[in-house]
From Swiss-Prot:
E.C. designation(s): 4.1.1.39
Species, as recorded: Albidiferax ferrireducens (strain ATCC BAA-621 / DSM 15236 / T118)
Molecular function terms, GO-annotated: magnesium ion binding; monooxygenase activity; ribulose-bisphosphate carboxylase activity
Name of the encoding gene: cbbM
GO biological processes: reductive pentose-phosphate cycle
Further details from the record: The basic functional RuBisCO is composed of a large chain homodimer in a 'head-to-tail' conformation. In contrast to form I RuBisCO, the form II RuBisCO are composed solely of large subunits.
Positions that bind Mg(2+): 191, 193-194
HAMAP family registered for this protein in UniProt: RuBisCO_L_type2 (MF_01339)
Disulfide bonds, paired cysteine numbers: none
Cofactor note: Binds 1 Mg(2+) ion per subunit.
Descriptive protein name: Ribulose bisphosphate carboxylase
Annotated site, Transition state stabilizer, chain positions: 329
Active site: 166, 287
UniProt subunit comment: Homodimer.
Length: 459
């Protein structure tokens, strides 16, 4: 059935829709099944995403038609389709009237992902007006709160040197805490790897007190504050809160040094929002494990990593992983930096839409996945600043001298970039950074030809 007369209006102007502030706009790459009309398929997509179905129904009235989602732009050659969703379509909380991300996902990337006449459809960007931003929580804490704890300026406080306890599984409580202590002697921030939780060989109630003791000992030895991001992800929100409450009790007066990690893609929006609302005094660390099944460039359905990052800021993530922009082991490219810019700035041009955030707090780009000191200068060149958290597991625990030396090498890499120095020359005056060349020789060979001769290192 051709629904284009109802669910498409190509006379609508995007600028006018944005100025009106009464729609969420979504941009997709969409292709219909072979032989089908593009606009008809797009209109069916909009119908399925709002008030319609595959037939006319007798219960439709004039009010219903007023909240139809409308296709307002198509370009079949480039597979571009844009839809305007009236705000009235979206579900609101009965407790406080706020928007729910699950409603946005249900409509904008819900049933439409399995439609029989659609070959593929992937959301590449969306625009939310000021009213919608006001009706989401947004972050309660941001990187400035961590800089303050670390004794740094709260503006442009710089690189936070972090790690992930490795190996990701298999460490019992005492070795786990010792691994944390060894890194904290040189670094700032440790996160649980996302599978780490309450395994039978390392129960939280035994492990976490030992981790807190390691944090205090490292602080005493270095005279510097340390931070820990604890994984509270669980199927049951009561279990998640039980883990968080135990952690707060354990850390006591040092609770401000405790972040809560939620594996937000697998855990879902409800888990992220629960953590944000129940624990507004904690830095909310959004890990996105599993996202690649829909965000990967090889996937033509779902949504992009930039869309996920924008959603995380609306929900209130203090920080979210953004990959390594082609400099680590994970899939990505240099132009992924727009993802970082989108969540850290008050306004930013996305792939399609210019988004203003109207003063809500920023979300920190967290960089992780195969990074080490040798890869960081190039990463910073691409990003253009160092106001991030980097969690380098192998880059710390794979350093030949110690995890602490690995942490120091990461910091020295940032200082090298900030000084505009040549990494080889910098290494001659900074031992931990120099030893990173020997620790990661394959990266050294690829990035710094002739480094062995220049640093006097034998083959």
């Amino acid at each position: 059935m051709d629904q284009s007369k109802r669910y498409a209006d190509l006379s609508l102007q995007e600028a006018a829709l944005i100025a009106g502030g009464q729609h969420i706009l979504c941009a997709y790459k969409m292709a219909p099944k072979d032989g089908l009309n593009y606009l008809e398929a797009a209109a069916h997509f909009a119908a399925e995403s709002s008030t319609g179905t595959n037939v006319e129904v007798c219960t439709t009235d004039d009010f219903t038609r007023d909240v139809d989602a409308l296709v307002y732009y198509v370009n079949e050659a480039t597979e571009d389709m844009r839809i305007a969703y009236p705000l009235a379509l979206f579900d609101r909380n009965i407790t406080d009237g706020r928007f729910m991300l699950v409603s946005f996902l249900t409509l904008a990337v819900g049933n439409n992902q399995g439609m029989g006449d659609i070959k593929h459809a992937k959301m590449i960007d969306f625009y939310v007006p000021e009213r919608v931003i006001q009706m989401f929580d947004g972050p309660a804490k941001d990187i400035s709160d961590l800089w303050r704890i670390l004794g740094r300026p709260v503006k442009d406080g710089g690189f936070i040197v972090g790690t992930i306890i490795k190996p990701k599984l298999g460490l019992r409580p005492e070795p786990f805490a010792q691994a944390a202590y060894q890194f904290w002697l040189g670094g700032d921030f440790i996160k649980n790897d996302e599978p780490q939780g309450n395994q039978v060989f390392s129960p939280i109630k035994k492990t976490l007190p030992l981790v807190y003791d390691a944090l205090k000992r490292a602080q005493d030895e270095t005279g510097q504050a340390k931070l820990f991001s604890m994984n509270i992800t669980a199927d049951d929100h009561f279990e998640m809160c039980a883990r968080a409450d135990f952690a707060l009790e354990t850390f006591g007066a040092d609770a401000d040094k405790l972040a809560f990690l939620v594996d937000g893609f697998v855990g879902g929006p409800g888990m992220v929002t629960t953590a944000r609302r129940q624990y507004p005094n904690q830095y909310l660390h959004y890990h996105r494990g599993g996202h690649g099944m829909v965000t990967s460039p090889s996937s033509k359905r779902g949504y992009t990593a930039l869309v996920l990052a924008k959603m995380s800021r609306l929900q209130g993530a203090s920080g979210i992983h953004v990959g390594t922009m082609g400099h680590g082991k994970m899939e990505g490219a240099g132009d992924d930096r727009v993802m970082a810019y989108m969540i850290e700035r008050d306004e930013c041009q996305g792939p399609v839409y210019f988004q203003k955030w109207y003063g809500i707090k920023p979300t920190t780009p967290i960089v992780s996945g195969g990074m080490n000191a040798l890869r960081l200068p190039g990463f910073f060149d691409n990003l253009g600043h160092g106001n991030i958290i980097n969690t380098a597991g192998g880059g710390s625990y794979g350093h030949l001298d110690s995890p602490a030396a690995g942490a120091v090498s990461l910091r020295q890499a940032y200082e090298c970039w900030k000084a505009g120095a040549d990494p080889i020359e910098w290494a001659k005056e900074h031992r931990e950074f120099a030893r990173a060349f020997e620790s990661f020789p394959q990266d050294a060979d690829r990035l710094f030809a002739g480094w062995r001769d220049k640093l006097g290192v034998g083959a």
